């Protein structure tokens, strides 16, 4: 294929008025990428610099190639990187990179922008492998003072993209930090006359800060960088100012420990003054700066509470700033959007979020200035002041001690409830939110006789109001039920009939504007989950409502619906199924007579041509039915199996994870009878976990379900044991793919799933110790890993399972054959820590005591 032909394909795929031509062109491009990536990549880079090709085609060439190098899916990104490394020759790589760098300095900004993204994608693959070593020098040279504006801007943009997409622990970028910093500072300093260059430099700085730790640790370099950023906050251009404050937020987040002198010398006064800026964007960024300070100090306080020996130190910036910052925040609360239906983030919302963080950080110290503001404004003539007062009160419901909050809620609640009848929609919406905050954070302050009837009445009125008010009222009801249901006796059940009637009315809305209908269904789900026998009749009315509602949706002729109406119907069915699943789980004994009818409805829903949207919810409801019926569900398995296998095979879809969870539910329902299906299910699960295209969330889901199956089929799991243990060992030994929080969290999920698997395997083989014996050492190695990782051992459920495993294994081997494992220092220490840990539940401490007894028996053998 020639460059001209390839360019024509690109142009057709985006510019052709004929949809068939567009689709055909896209298909041909994808086919070429799959069949001959070397040619595809080369042609893309040639079109990018071909000035005879239309602008849109050139831009698309860069972006299409970029999208074949990186993906939001980490598995695909690894596959793309391997393809680039193995299928593209060194000569071709050099030519593609040369073409990308040529396009980067184009005077057409859209070409340069696309090239910057392409360069970052290539760098993301090459730099970690030590390739393209000259790139950083090129970037520095491109940002020199003598370079044209367009070259500097585009090169800084590329640097920002590189840093944004890279692994935070990338040694390639850390080792290039000097060059990165030189390039950025050249563009960010006040001597740079171009706004576009300065803005690009500041944005790149925000993305690069994590890689310049070594530079920030050197006082001279840190001082100079802080000077450049502080000067930028005083620029005449609003965008540059806002970007500079964005950098200060990131600097405070990453380098809090160095910030004391800068706060004292400049940042404190600078940010206080700038909070009064008439420009909302700049004021918002300044508020964000103080939010960042609060977040850091909250984290430090938590760290010091958990680990008193930690070297971290809090400078209490927020606490010492209350008298200056909080009054400004309170004033900013009155700068709301004029349009009550405008939900765009604004400076008022930023101030409210910041006030919440100040309350969490400073506790009772926040009360005086806020309550004074509330008292002065809650009955003001201007709706902005009334709304701000209610927002301020709701924002301090988490932080000060409960005695103080309870006292002030008693005083303020009558006035707040009155505002549910306000003429201003904004005031009513925020009032409903404020009541929800009270119910969530300090529900015990709502006196059952004095306040609760008024709160419930306010919610019932709000459910019939504007959708935004109704949504907040549903949330308030959820909080009331969750927080008050545990009381003995609970006052909330007296109001169940009225609340359910109100929610059913809201759930019958014809639309879901501002999520009002869905919120009502969520509240109904909560009502079901917390219902007791005293409100059985009311619970039955929810069951009747959702069954009738589901029947109504099933009778709709979907062929006559517009796309928007069809989506609304699917959304409604999803909401109904969520409540129905809760009803089924809550009343398992009443399910059997209607099980055939329910399964018939579920099969009809799965048969719909566009069932993908609700498939997950249908599976969740069927799981609830399986759990309720127990072994009685087996009669549906033959009919249901094709749907289950279809879902399991959709390894790139969330429904596959739900389907895996369904297997766990089925194995728990059928117990030992699940052995009849274990061969087929284990085969499918093994294929899923080894599929390179599978969603990565599948791995922990599948590992965990192995434990469910093992615990239920017992000795019949032995034929799979060797293969499953190999998978578990591989999983427990894998390292995070990078240093991002997402990657670290995923690794924790995988390790927790391995623990689930081991717990199930040990439980299932309790009568077959000889089968487990070869793997005891492996399991103990894993428990040691848990005992050493604070992210694992600090979790109550995780430590309970791990020490329980130590005890369970000991009980299986009363002959002393595994005695050597129980004398290890870490075993003694871990059991002791778990038994005496203040943060652990009594159940976990009891499990640790039992494990200690089992350990002592082992050592006495």
From Swiss-Prot:
Domain (Importin N-terminal): residue spans on this chain: 25-106
Further remark: Binds to nucleoporin FxFG but not GLFG repeat regions. Ran-GTP can disrupt the importin alpha/beta heterodimer by binding to the beta subunit and releases both subunits from the docking site. The stoichiometric complex between importin beta and Ran-GTP renders the latter inaccessible to Ran-specific GTPase activating protein (Ran-GAP) thereby inhibiting GTP hydrolysis stimulated by Ran-GAP.
Lineage: superkingdom: Eukaryota
Protein name as catalogued: Importin subunit beta-1
Taxonomic lineage from the root: Eukaryota, Fungi, Dikarya, Ascomycota, Saccharomycotina
GO process annotations (BP): import into nucleus; mRNA transport; NLS-bearing protein import into nucleus; nuclear pore complex assembly; phosphatidylcholine biosynthetic process; protein import into nucleus; protein targeting to membrane; regulation of nucleocytoplasmic transport
Keyword Signal (UniProt): no
Localization of this protein: Cytoplasm; Nucleus; Nucleus, Nuclear pore complex
N-acetylserine: residues carrying this PTM: 2
Subunit and interaction comment: Forms a complex with the importin alpha subunit (SRP1/KAP60). Interacts with Ran (GSP1); interacts specifically with the GTP-bound form of Ran (GTP-Ran), protecting it from GTP hydrolysis and nucleotide exchange. Interacts with nucleoporin NUP1.
Record-stated family: Belongs to the importin beta family. Importin beta-1 subfamily.
Modified residues (Phosphoserine): 836
Signal sequence residues: none
HEAT repeats (start-end): 3-35, 37-66, 90-129, 134-164, 177-208, 219-255, 260-306, 317-362, 367-395, 402-442, 452-484, 496-530, 536-586, 592-629, 634-669, 675-713, 718-764, 773-812, 819-859
Function, as annotated: Importin beta subunit that functions in nuclear protein import through association with the importin alpha subunit, which binds to the classical nuclear localization signal (cNLS) in cargo substrates. Docking of the importin/substrate complex to the nuclear pore complex (NPC) is mediated by importin beta through binding to nucleoporin FxFG repeats and the complex is subsequently translocated through the pore by an energy requiring, Ran-dependent mechanism. At the nucleoplasmic side of the NPC, GTP-Ran binds to importin beta and the three components separate, leading to release of the cargo.
């Amino acid at each position: 294929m020639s460059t001209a032909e390839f360019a024509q394909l690109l142009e057709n795929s985006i510019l052709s008025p004929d949809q068939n031509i567009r689709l055909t062109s896209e298909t041909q491009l994808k086919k070429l990428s799959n069949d001959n990536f070397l040619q595809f990549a080369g042609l893309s880079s040639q079109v990018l610099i071909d000035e005879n090709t239309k602008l849109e085609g050139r831009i698309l060439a860069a972006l299409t190639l970029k999208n074949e190098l990186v993906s939001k899916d980490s598995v695909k990104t690894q596959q793309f990187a391997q393809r680039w490394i193995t299928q593209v020759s060194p000569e071709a790589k050099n030519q593609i990179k040369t073409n990308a760098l040529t396009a980067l300095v184009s005077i057409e900004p859209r070409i340069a922008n696309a090239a910057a993204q392409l360069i970052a994608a290539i760098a993301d693959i090459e730099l970690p492998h030590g390739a393209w070593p000259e790139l950083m020098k090129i970037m520095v040279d491109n940002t020199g003072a003598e370079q044209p504006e367009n070259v500097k801007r585009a090169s800084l943009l590329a640097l920002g993209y590189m840093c944004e997409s890279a692994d935070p622990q990338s040694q390639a970028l850390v080792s290039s930090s000097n060059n990165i910093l030189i390039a950025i500072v050249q563009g960010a300093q006040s001597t740079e006359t171009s706004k576009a260059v300065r803005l690009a430099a500041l944005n790149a700085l925000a993305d690069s800060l994590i890689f310049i730790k070594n530079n920030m640790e050197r006082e001279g370099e840190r001082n100079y960088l802080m000077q450049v950023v502080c000067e930028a906050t005083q620029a005449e251009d609003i965008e540059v100012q806002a970007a500079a404050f964005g950098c200060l937020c990131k600097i405070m987040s990453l380098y809090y420990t160095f910030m004391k002198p800068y706060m004292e010398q400049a940042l404190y006064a600078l940010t206080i003054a700038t909070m009064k800026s008439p420009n909302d964007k700049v004021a918002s960024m300044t508020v964000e700066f103080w939010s960042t300070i609060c977040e850091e100090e909250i984290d430090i306080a938590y760290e010091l509470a958990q680990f008193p020996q930690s070297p971290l130190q809090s400078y209490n910036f927020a606490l010492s700033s209350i008298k200056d910052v909080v009054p400004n925040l309170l004033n900013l609360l009155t700068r709301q959007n004029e349009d009550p239906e405008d939900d765009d983030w604004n400076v008022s919302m930023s101030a409210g979020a910041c006030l919440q963080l100040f309350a969490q950080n400073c506790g009772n110290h926040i009360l005086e200035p806020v309550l004074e503001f509330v008292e002065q404004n809650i009955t003001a003539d201007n709706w902005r002041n009334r709304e701000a007062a209610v927002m301020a009160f709701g924002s301090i419901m988490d932080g000060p001690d409960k005695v103080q909050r309870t006292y002030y809620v008693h005083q303020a609640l009558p006035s707040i409830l009155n505002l549910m009848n306000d003429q201003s929609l904004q005031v009513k919406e925020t009032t409903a939110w404020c009541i929800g905050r009270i119910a969530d954070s300090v529900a015990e302050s709502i006196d059952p006789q004095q306040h609760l009837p008024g709160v419930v009445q306010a919610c019932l009125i709000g459910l019939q109001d504007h959708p935004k008010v109704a949504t907040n009222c549903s949330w308030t009801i959820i909080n009331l039920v969750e927080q008050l249901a545990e009381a003995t006796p609970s006052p909330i059940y007296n109001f169940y009939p009225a609340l359910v009637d109100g929610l059913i009315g809201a759930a019958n809305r014809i639309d879901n504007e501002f999520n009002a209908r869905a919120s009502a269904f969520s509240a109904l789900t909560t009502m079901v989950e917390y219902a007791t026998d005293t409100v059985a009749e009311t619970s039955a009315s929810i069951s009747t409502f959702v069954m009738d509602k589901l029947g109504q949706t099933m009778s709709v002729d979907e062929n006559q619906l517009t796309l928007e109406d069809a989506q609304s119907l699917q959304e409604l069915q999803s909401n109904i199924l969520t409540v129905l699943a809760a009803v089924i789980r809550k009343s398992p004994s009443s399910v059997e007579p209607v099980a055939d009818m329910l399964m018939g409805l579920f099969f009809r829903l799965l048969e719909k041509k566009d069932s993908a949207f609700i498939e997950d919810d249908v599976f969740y409801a069927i799981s609830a039915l399986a759990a309720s019926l127990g072994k009685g569900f087996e009669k549906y398995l033959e009919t249901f199996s094709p749907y289950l296998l279809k879902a399991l095979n959709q390894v790139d879809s969330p429904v596959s994870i739900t389907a895996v969870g369904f297997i766990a539910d089925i194995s728990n329902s059928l117990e030992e009878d699940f052995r009849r299906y274990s061969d087929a299910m284990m085969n499918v699960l093994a294929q899923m976990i080894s599929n390179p295209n599978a969603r990565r969330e599948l791995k922990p889901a599948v590992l965990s379900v192995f434990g469910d199956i093992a615990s239920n089929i017992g000795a019949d799991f032995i034929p799979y044991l060797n293969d499953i243990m190999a998978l578990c060992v591989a999983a427990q030994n894998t390292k995070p793919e990078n240093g991002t929080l997402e990657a670290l969290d995923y690794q924790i999920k995988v390790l927790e799933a391995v623990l689930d698997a081991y717990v199930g395997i040990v439980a299932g083989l309790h009568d077959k110790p000889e089968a487990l014996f070869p793997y005891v050492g492996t399991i103990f190695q894993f428990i040691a890993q848990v005992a050493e990782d604070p992210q694992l051992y600090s979790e109550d459920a995780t430590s309970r399972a791990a020490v329980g495993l130590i005890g369970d294994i000991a009980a299986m081997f009363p002959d002393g054959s595994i005695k050597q494992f129980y004398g290890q220092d870490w075993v003694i220490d871990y059991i002791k820590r778990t038994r005496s840990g203040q943060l652990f539940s009594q159940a976990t401490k009891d499990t640790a005591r039992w494990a200690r007894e089992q350990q002592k028996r082992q050592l006495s053998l």
